[in-house]
Amino acid sequence: MDKTTVYLPDELKAAVKRAARQRGVSEAQVIRESIRAAVGGAKPPPRGGLYAGSEPIARRVDELLAGFGER
């Protein structure tokens, strides 16, 4: 874990201290949990393509669009 310094206004520092005391945890724990809740935990898994498959759809564009727009 890396050490980070954060400057807090007096009223926010007092709120962190109060929350830590009420929950029986350290102020650092309250701050870590608050940051985690605000920015999320782990990175989201990478998303696949919209039409993820073994063959790129662009290779079949002519076949797939044959007759498109014709009546």
Swiss-Prot record:
Keywords: Toxin-antitoxin system. GO terms for biological process: positive regulation of growth; regulation of DNA-templated transcription. Coiled coil: none annotated. Antitoxin component of a type II toxin-antitoxin (TA) system. Upon expression in M.smegmatis neutralizes the effect of cognate toxin VapC26. This is Antitoxin VapB26. It comes from Mycobacterium tuberculosis (strain ATCC 25618 / H37Rv). The gene is vapB26.
